[in-house]
Curated annotation (Swiss-Prot):
UniProt pathway: Cell wall biogenesis; peptidoglycan biosynthesis
Gene Ontology biological process terms, A to Z: cell wall organization; peptidoglycan biosynthetic process; regulation of cell shape
UniProt-annotated binding residues for Mg(2+) 1: 278, 292
Stated role: Cell wall formation.
Pfam assignment, any one: Dala_Dala_lig_C
HAMAP family named among the record's database cross-references: Dala_Dala_lig (MF_00047)
Name of the protein in question: D-alanine--D-alanine ligase
Native species: Albidiferax ferrireducens (strain ATCC BAA-621 / DSM 15236 / T118)
Residues binding Mg(2+) 2, per UniProt: 292, 294
NCBIfam families: D_ala_D_alaTIGR (TIGR01205), PRK01372.1 (NF002378)
Gene giving rise to this polypeptide: ddl
Keywords: ATP-binding, Cell shape, Cell wall biogenesis/degradation, Cytoplasm, Ligase, Magnesium, Manganese, Metal-binding, Nucleotide-binding, Peptidoglycan synthesis
Length: 346
């Protein structure tokens, strides 16, 4: 399942041949970074990494912060493609994707509908459940009292988090009913919709995915070992104490099964281009449970998609170019025909 199908242009292609052709076809590229979400700081780190990687591959790439500039300027300034390195709301929730559809500028990652569904954890879980895919039990709550009721139903520990945030922002692991009020208040500061989810004790893994349709495939599974099991915002991005194990050293046959599960989770939501699926493996039964999907994954020095790609022999610059090569639109600006990614190797 971890076949790649990417040429590492940085090491395999002579200057001025295939890479030059790809860069010329892509034209002027905007790397969208920053934005107005709670994940702005991480987005800026991702965007700067992507920007420098694309430039190193000969792409005419430029930084563009939608929090500081109007998206309409993309058309005025002649940008022909966008690499979306935005995270969270107003970046990976379908809003920017919809604007780029109207502007007729192909962009990386999932389209409008898949993006808007995937950022909504409750809606995502409902779809996965309807498709027979395993995900932890949950309750959607709108008050501290409802959070306490969810705790009584789901048991301890319970995860309380905003429905439409990422990077563990606003998340609390609740072990006593007295913590429910504060946990709800923290999550509700970030979103009016709050999710209470049954905690699964076991191995935390993540599975990056690349490609679209029948060409989509999983990269190697990464197992995450955080200090005291606390994979929070700080441990994700700003410390070196979290261990990332790739190969994940899972029992025989388990990695392939989890890759297939992640691929199915990606496909039933209609995702394309790339994403990352987070999974918990029950310590007792070894059953995997889908947690959530990220349709605009981080590309920082601590990020997981570049880590999995590297384990598969793909450099960071080649990964960025491959993601950009799949930039497309739901519908063309005129005529209504869906644009397809180039079949030219990156």
């Amino acid at each position: 399942m971890s076949q790649i199908g990417i040429n590492d242009g940085a090491s395999q292609q002579p200057a001025g041949t295939t890479l030059g052709g790809v860069a010329a076809r892509l034209g002027k590229v905007a790397v969208l970074m920053g934005g107005a979400s709670a994940e702005r700081e991480v987005s800026l780190m991702s965007g700067q990494g992507v920007l420098q990687a694309l430039i190193s591959q000969g792409v005419d790439a430029h930084a563009f912060d939608p929090a500081e500039r109007d998206l309409a300027e993309l058309k005025v300034e002649g940008f022909s493609h966008c690499f979306i390195a935005l995270h969270g709301r107003f970046g990976e929730d379908g809003t920017v994707q919809g604007a780029l559809e109207l502007l007729g500028i192909p962009y990386t990652g999932s389209g409008v509908m898949a993006s808007s569904i995937a950022i909504d954890k409750v809606m995502t879980k409902r779809i996965w459940r309807s498709e027979g895919l395993p995900t932890p039990e949950w309750r959607q709550v709108d008050s501290a009292a409802a959070t306490s009721e969810a705790f009584a139903a789901l048991g301890s520990p319970m995860i309380v988090k905003p429905d439409r945030e990422g990077s563990t922002i606003g998340l609390t692991k609740v072990t006593q009913i007295e913590q429910c009020g504060a946990a709800y208040a923290l999550a509700a500061r970030h979103d009016a919709m709050v999710l209470c989810e049954q905690f699964v004790k076991g191995d935390e893994v993540t599975i990056p995915l690349l490609g679209s349709g029948a060409g989509a495939h999983a990269l190697p599974v990464i197992r995450i070992v955080a200090p005291d099991g606390n994979y929070d915002y700080q441990n994700k991005y700003f410390t070196d104490t979290t261990q990332y194990l790739v190969p994940a050293n899972l029992p025989a046959g388990e990695e392939a099964h989890i890759q297939q599960l992640a691929l199915k989770a990606y496909q039933v939501l209609g995702c394309r281009g790339w994403a990352r699926v987070d999974v918990m493996i029950d310590a007792r039964t070894r059953a995997p449970f889908l947690l959530e999907i990220n349709t605009s994954p981080g590309m920082t020095p601590h990020s997981l998609v570049p880590m999995a790609a590297k384990a598969a022999g793909v450099s960071y610059p080649a990964l960025c170019l491959e993601v950009l090569r799949h930039a497309t639109l739901d519908y063309a600006a005129a005529g209504g025909d869906a644009q397809q990614p180039s079949t030219e190797p990156a």
